[in-house]
Amino acid sequence: MKVAIVFDSAGTLVKIMRVIKDLKKNKFICNSQTVDIVDKKKGRALVIIKEDPLKVVDKENPEKLISDLLKEVEIGISYCNPPINREGIFKDRKTKVKELQEPLNILKRYEVETGYGSALIIDTYAGEVEYTIATAGCLFKEVKETIKQLKDLGVKVFIASGDRKGFIKRLAEITGVDERYIMAEAHQELKRDLIRNLKKEGYFTIMVGDGANDVPAMIESDLAVVTLQNGNVSRRALETADIKIYNIKEIVDICKKVINGEIKGRMQIKECS
């Protein structure tokens, strides 16, 4: 049997450090996923800066408008609560770059493996930056060995993530995942389409994630797995998953059972539960 597994990155392979600033309250938020914040309001978009924030955010004039910065750098929408107004991404005329620098400066105090990311949550209809975000992370200690064992079993391993390309390329380097099998800046439809295409190629597909943006791919997959290792899981992902795991290494035994015919897919899991 041909088996392909698609991993999300943040919270799944990487112990993520995420600093989110609520600009209206002027406070930092703990234990929240950015996609869950986006889901709370129509018209919100999670906008990522595709370039290294240490080069394009950290060194920028703090008093510069964020909307002007966004016009100068490469950006992407990794998640949204449609419908959105794309022009509204550039309409905020009061929020300054220092609001992006503040969460980044907090994370710069830590030693990280994956590099840094900067993002914003924007109300695209109000034309207002509501949250600024910085991310960084370190691999869960079991990840390298887990991926090695999966490859030894003949499982094709993919990483599909909304994170910027530099972040995901670095993750592929340190985990041993073939760079041909990574998908950066992947919104939820791209993850779903990856699963769909792998199924067309004859693979039994497993989607592993913990976020709301993993849910369409989970639904499309033959088997959906949610990982609880990071400790902060989207309710939608939890409700959609067929199997819950508490450590990423558990996925090896799941794949063995799939290969041996002990797990034949979603229907069998539901019949046994």
From Swiss-Prot:
InterPro entries assigned to the protein according to its UniProt record, in alphabetical order: HAD-like_sf (IPR036412), HAD_sf (IPR023214)
Purpose: Most probably acts as a phosphatase in the cytosol.
Record field: temperature dependence: Optimum temperature is 50 degrees Celsius.
Regulation of activity: Inhibited by orthovanadate.
Superkingdom classification of source: Archaea
GO molecular function, one term: ATP binding
Protein's UniProt name: Soluble P-type ATPase-like phosphatase
Keywords: ATP-binding, Hydrolase, Magnesium, Metal-binding, Nucleotide-binding, Phosphoprotein
Reported cofactor(s): Mg(2+)
Source organism of the structure: Methanocaldococcus jannaschii (strain ATCC 43067 / DSM 2661 / JAL-1 / JCM 10045 / NBRC 100440) (Methanococcus jannaschii)
Annotated active site: D8 (4-aspartylphosphate intermediate)
Family to which the UniProt record says this protein belongs: Belongs to the cation transport ATPase (P-type) (TC 3.A.3) family. Type IB subfamily.
UniProt EC number: 3.6.3.-
